[in-house]
Curated annotation (Swiss-Prot):
This is Putative sensor histidine kinase NtrY-like. It catalyses: ATP + protein L-histidine = ADP + protein N-phospho-L-histidine. PANTHER family: SENSOR HISTIDINE KINASE CPXA. Residues 378-589 form the Histidine kinase domain. Pfam families: HAMP, HATPase_c, HisKA, NtrY_N. It comes from Rickettsia prowazekii (strain Madrid E).
Length: 599
């Protein structure tokens, strides 16, 4: 059995660890898949492989969770509730997730279409075209200017070729007149600057690509791209030998920045537009995996949550089945549940079972008492009739013939024995009658302290070999009761104590009256032989006795009277010697009963 328990525990924890490991692996796998999809250099075989791994992990996780749940609950009828709750949790998680997923994908696609609408693409393209047109127009104007300056310089060839100062002055005049930011005349053969305007930057043929110089040799202006903020044109001067004119015009920085921003935005927009399919795939995959993960979490949470709810209900169902089979000793553990509705239900169930057990016990006792009551009536009737003539005949024989018989002492002894045993039988019959015909109490206001003390004094006179003590925390106490029946209670209890002391050298009976809150107790303690342990729980049942002088109805009568007065009779043995009988009356209940009865 111990090995089976270890095996079950090992299997339980291994399955939980496996499920936890798979859950962690699923999260790592999804994140890795997303990373692989996000890479610029995509390997679709790798992406498909990771997607298959994700799907396999989720399928295994789902199978394990389903198997764990349904295997645990398959053989138990009470698991139907747990199954319904888990299914409800799954539906509550799945339906909104599916709805949100569908609408999210739908609105995401709508949003993407709105972002990459044709109108937006047209606006961006037009912006780029406007920017390019602006630059192109500047280039065309600069080309025309370069041709015009080259023409002027060629016309003045003979005046300028041998006069560098005039060449420089003429070049500056052309630059000022045509709004050029720079103008440079370069000699290719000597790689020197022949003339330049005042604000021109130093430049040599080494910085101009060879293929541009070849194009310039054809006589057409060629654009030289060396600085994004300046447009430059290179043209060969016709009349000069290997001499070239380089003119340039600055472009406003704000315009350059605006053009760069426009081109950058357009390029990024087109890049995103080309990647839109991949973005949609990423979003859909991530949303599907997150939805599945949420579904599995909801199922697992449903299993744990329902286990917490259904487990105490199962215990309650099991306990109810035991009660149905007649076991009224069963109790459900209240300390294992929270102090909520389940805890309240547990407490109510335990109270109900205790009450049923007590009522069943009382019913058995009442049925037994009723049966014995019927027997008592018949026996008392049958015995009482011959008792009186026997007793009278014995007394007359003793009176009439005791003086005439020689063996007088033996004759008297025999007759007295007959009389004594006849009286014993008569007392037994009286007990039978009293038990069978115990009337309902007639409640009147009585002074309890006086009643108890009066009975103690009477018992002292009958038993001078027993020491009686009395103690009370009240001097006077008005008590609603049937005084005759309370007298009977005290007499029976004290008589029971006296009989247990018989045969001892020193006997002592302590009587304590204790009034506290809404209760008053009458406690009787003796130093006798006490009750046999096996009879403690049965001492108040009818015809259970340890005495040879009665039929065991004394304490049964006491119990009936005490209960009629809303009290409880508690019987126990003292630790050292003797017994203790505690009679405790509930004054609130007693007053309510008296009020209901019209007393």
């Amino acid at each position: 059995m111990l090995s089976d328990l270890k095996q079950n525990l090992r299997s339980y924890f291994s399955s939980r660890i496996l499920i936890l490991a798979l859950a962690i692996a699923s999260i790592i796998s999804v994140c890795t898949t997303f990373y692989v999809i996000s890479l610029e250099a995509k390997n679709f075989s790798t992406i498909i492989g990771f997607l298959l791994i994700d799907l396999a992990i989720f399928l295994i996780l789902g199978i394990l969770l389903t198997q764990k749940f349904f295997t645990k609950n398959n053989d138990n009828d009470s698991s139907k509730l747990q199954n319904r709750i888990v299914i409800a949790f799954s539906l509550v998680a799945a339906i909104p997730t599916i709805i949100v997923s569908v609408f999210s994908v739908y609105f995401f696609n709508l949003s993407v279409k709105a972002w990459f609408d044709k109108k937006i693409s047209t606006v961006l393209d037009q912006s780029v075209i406007v920017a390019e047109t602006y630059i192109a127009e500047h280039k065309v104007q600069l080309k025309e200017t370069a041709l015009a300056v080259a023409e002027d310089l060629s016309d003045m060839y003979y005046d300028l070729i041998h006069n560098p100062a005039l060449f420089t002055k003429t070049l500056n005049t052309e630059a000022d007149m045509r709004s050029l930011d720079e103008a440079i005349v370069l000699n290719k053969s000597t790689n020197t600057i022949v003339a330049n305007s005042y604000l021109s930057f130093s430049l040599s043929f080494a910085t101009i690509p060879a293929h541009l110089i070849k194009k310039a040799d054809l006589g057409e202006p060629v654009e030289v791209k060396s600085d994004p903020t300046t447009i430059r044109m290179l043209i060969k001067l016709k009349e000069y030998n290997d001499v070239y004119l380089l003119v340039g015009r600055l472009v406003d920085n704000k315009i350059i920045d605006h053009i760069d921003a426009t081109n950058g935005a357009a390029a990024e927009y087109n890049s995103l537009k080309n990647e839109i399919d991949n973005i949609q795939i990423k979003f859909s995959i991530m949303f599907i995996f997150i939805a599945l993960l949420l579904l599995f979490v909801a199922i697992n949470f449903g299993v744990l949550f329902t286990a917490k709810i259904v487990k105490p209900i199962k215990k309650l169902v099991t306990a109810t089945d035991k009660v149905k089979d007649g076991d009224l000793t069963v109790q459900v553990p209240e300390n294992e549940v929270d102090k909520d509705e389940i805890g309240t239900l547990y407490a109510a169930f335990n109270r109900m079972i205790k009450q049923l057990s007590r009522q069943q016990r009382d019913l058995v006792i009442a049925q037994r008492a009723m049966a014995w009551s019927d027997v008592a009536k018949k026996v008392a009737h049958e015995i009482k009739n011959p008792l009186t003539p026997i007793l009278l005949a014995s007394e007359r024989l003793l009176k009439k013939f005791s003086s005439e018989i020689n063996e007088k002492s033996e004759f008297e002894s025999y007759l007295k024995m007959i009389i004594r045993h006849t009286n014993d039988i008569k007392n037994i019959v009286s007990e039978f009658v009293l038990f069978a015909r115990l009337p309902a109490p007639k409640f009147t206001k009585s002074e309890l302290v006086y009643l108890v003390k009066h009975i103690i004094e009477a018992r002292k006179l009958l038993n001078d070999n027993i020491v009686y003590t009395y103690d009370s925390n009240v001097d006077q106490f008005d008590f609603m009761c049937d005084a005759t029946q309370i007298n009977q209670v005290m007499i029976n209890v004290l008589k029971n104590a006296e009989e247990s002391i018989e045969g001892q050298e020193f006997g002592k009976i302590d009587v304590i009256l204790d009034a506290k809150d809404d209760f008053i107790s009458v406690i009787v303690m003796d130093n006798g032989k006490g009750f046999p342990p096996e009879l403690i729980g049965k001492a108040t049942e009818s015809y259970v006795t340890t005495s040879s002088k009665g039929m065991g109805v004394g304490l049964a009568i006491v119990k009936r009277i005490v209960e009629e007065h809303c009290g409880v009779l508690d019987i126990a043995n003292r630790e050292d010697e003797g017994a203790i009988i505690d009679i405790k009356f509930d004054l609130k209940e007693l007053h309510l009963k008296v009020r209901r009865s019209g007393g």
